[in-house]
Amino acid sequence: MQLHKEIIDLRSDTVTKPCSKMLEAMMSAEVGDDVFNEDPTVKELQNKTAELFGMEDALFCTSGTMTNQLAIKAHTQPGEELICDQNSHIYHYESAGIAFNSGVQSKLIQGDRGRITAQQIEQAINPDQDWLAKTSLVCLENTVNKAGGS
C-alpha cells in the first residue's frame, strides 16, 4: 500500500497557493460589483454566515488583518485603549494598525503562552480618570502564534 503524503501549510494565508480546481472555481464563479451589492457569490456567503451565527447580517473581508482592524474601529473611539496579550497578532503583525486606523493605544498583558486571565484583564482596566485613556476593548486571540500557538 502506498501512502499519499501531502503537506498543507497553514502558517498564513499569504503562503497558500490555490490548486487547479480552486482556480477553475474562481474563473467560473458568477461575479458582480460588491460595492453595489451585485456580487451573488459574496451575498450568498454573507447570508449563510449571518444565518450560521444567528445574526441579521454579515460582512465578507479579504483577510484576518482587515477583519481585526474593522472590529477594533467599530468598538473603540480615538484616544481610547484596548487590552491584549503582549504577543498578540494585532499588536505585532498588523503594521501599527491599531494606532493608525483607530487612534487607539494598546495595553499589553504578559500572558502564559498567549493566555491571559480575567484577573489580569480586570487589573489592567484603567480607572475612570480624565487623564487616563478609557479602556474600551479587550482583544483575545485563538491561537497566539508568537506565543507558541496556544
Where do the language-model regions lie?
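Conserved core of the PLP fold type I
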Residues: 56-76, 109-111, 142
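Structural motif
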Residues: 8, 57-60, 80-82, 105-107, ...
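Solvent-exposed alpha-helices and their adjacent loops that cap or buttress functional pockets
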Residues: 2-3, 50-53, 74-75, 99-101, ...
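PLP-dependent aminotransferase-class I/II
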Residues: 102-150
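Conserved PLP-anchoring active-site segment centered on the Schiff-base-forming lysine
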Residues: 74-92
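N-terminal amphipathic/basic leader segments beginning at the initiator methionine
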Residues: 1-25
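Conserved N-terminal alpha-helix of the aminotransferase class I/II PLP-enzyme fold
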Residues: 18-64, 85-91, 97-99
